[in-house]
């Protein structure tokens, strides 16, 4: 369910895009520093957006220049290390791990082989991240168990299944046991949107494979975009 939160480059001012790019590169460096060479493979726009949301207003910064491991000959603007980047890196690893485990469960044996291999390589990093963010890791586990139960019951309520996934993402708003109310609600609503859009995109594939899909469960096998409006 990753890949839906992307920057709209034409609508961004130059300084906004520079900040976004510096955050992306800073998060990549933070992932590599905390979790090794494999972790940056899971970096995406969703996690960059999460890092920006986790930043405290008083933590505004001036991007520094650093060398990218992908192109070490050229220096790029990067965010300096911060609590927001470290928290985003930890939560990114946890989400990536459970996404792989979910893929293994949903796909057939052979089709899930790449996810199995990646999960084995990511396991040490996941264990380290789970120690650093135990509450978030537990929230993700609990939400996925609840989602699995709803799927087995072929739950016809789109709201109920979307709410379960939204609470998973909402857990990322917690910082040292405290939860920012505004950020919490933003991530909750974002989680609902991601879940429903992903369900719509997966309709044909899930219908062909006979897998649970909340849109199909609600509107039947012939559900279409007209039903969703």
Report the location of each language-model feature.
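Acidic catalytic motifs of isoprenoid enzymes
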Residues: 1-185, 192, 196-229
